[in-house]
Amino acid sequence: MNDNLLLSNISDYNVQFINELKYQVRINPKKHALQTAKEVEGVFIQVLLKSMRSSLLKDNLLDNNQSRLYTDIYDQQLSQEISKKGIGLTDIILKQIEK
């Protein structure tokens, strides 16, 4: 499978999931507010990890499309695991949603 196609499929899945979540929030905002806040925190962590990783020097033999693909997938999984325990943003986001 082409690496770009795989990344595209992963991105499509994320977009579909976010669209489904937006739909659920419109139907019953109070029920899905916590899940939405957790998802926003997860996306923030993923962007943070990607930004930190991009600041590293990339002058090595392992810097290729395949390693970047698997690093992106790893960062996505890592961000999901970190966001399960949370870093404190969920409560702040939840307060903003409920205003």
UniProtKB/Swiss-Prot annotation:
One of its GO terms (biological process) is bacterial-type flagellum organization. The keyword Metal-binding does not apply. Keywords: Bacterial flagellum biogenesis. InterPro entries: Flagellar_prot_FlgJ_N. The keyword Cytoplasm does not apply. Belongs to the FlgJ family. This protein is shorter than other FlgJ proteins and lacks the muramidase domain. It may be degenerating and may no longer be functional. This is Putative flagellar protein FlgJ homolog. The lineage of its organism: Bacteria, Pseudomonadati, Pseudomonadota, Gammaproteobacteria, Enterobacterales. The gene is flgJ.
